[in-house]
């Protein structure tokens, strides 16, 4: 697993601010088409985040599959108990099946910018290069949020390994 954090200037509401770009990547032993199919399921998000983050979707539940240009809102509970960030909004900016890229723009009261891009690249018939790239801005909390995100995305990629090893299926 590789992890990189870079500082970068980004636009936030017309102002140039200093944010971070976190990149977490690893090789995984799974067919890229199968990984792509799983990635589009909301159940996968809930599984890879559990127990570090539990979601309480506004309106009761997430859709079964994510859809491009769709917006969903949720409450996030750290470790299933502690509310964080108020309402967290995810806008599915891009779901590109050809290039296997899922990209969201996300925000809440703490993480003003949480832009997440997941890329899958085929290495062999049964292995992929999986990359999470997250651009983060949270004002004076940017460093703390980025440190937490680093731990969180490493954890998520380890949870992917459980999915692969146990061949976990999602509806």
Protein language model features and the residues they cover:
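Generic short beta-strand segments
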Residues: 7, 72-77, 133-137
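Hydrophobic ligand-binding cavity/cleft-lining segments
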Residues: 1-67
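Short, highly charged C-terminal tails/helix-capping segments
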Residues: 57, 61, 162-171
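A non-catalytic, amphipathic alpha-helix used as a structural packing/dimerization or gating element
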Residues: 151-159
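Short, surface-exposed coil-to-beta transition loops
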Residues: 21-23, 84-90, 112-117
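Beta-strand/loop substructures that line and gate deep hydrophobic ligand-binding cavities in soluble
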Residues: 103-151
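Glycine-rich portal/gate segments that line the openings of hydrophobic small-molecule binding cavities
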Residues: 46-47, 56-106
């Amino acid at each position: 697993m590789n992890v990189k954090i870079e500082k970068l200037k980004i636009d936030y509401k017309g102002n140039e601010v200093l944010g971070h770009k976190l990149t977490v990547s690893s090789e995984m032993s799974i067919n890229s088409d199968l990984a792509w199919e799983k990635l589009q399921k909301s159940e996968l998000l809930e599984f890879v985040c559990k127990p570090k983050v539990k979601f309480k979707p506004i309106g009761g539940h997430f859709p079964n599959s994510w859809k491009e240009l769709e917006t969903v809102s949720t409450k996030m509970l750290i470790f299933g108990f502690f509310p964080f960030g108020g309402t967290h909004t995810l806008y599915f900016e891009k779901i590109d099946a050809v290039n296997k890229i899922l990209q969201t723009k996300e925000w809440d009261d703490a993480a003003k910018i949480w832009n997440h891009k997941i890329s899958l690249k085929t290495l062999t018939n049964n292995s992929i290069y999986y990359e999470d790239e997250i651009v983060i801005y949270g004002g004076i909390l940017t460093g703390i949020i980025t440190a937490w995100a680093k731990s969180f995305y490493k954890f998520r990629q380890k949870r992917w390994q459980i999915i692969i090893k146990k061949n976990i299926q999602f509806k």
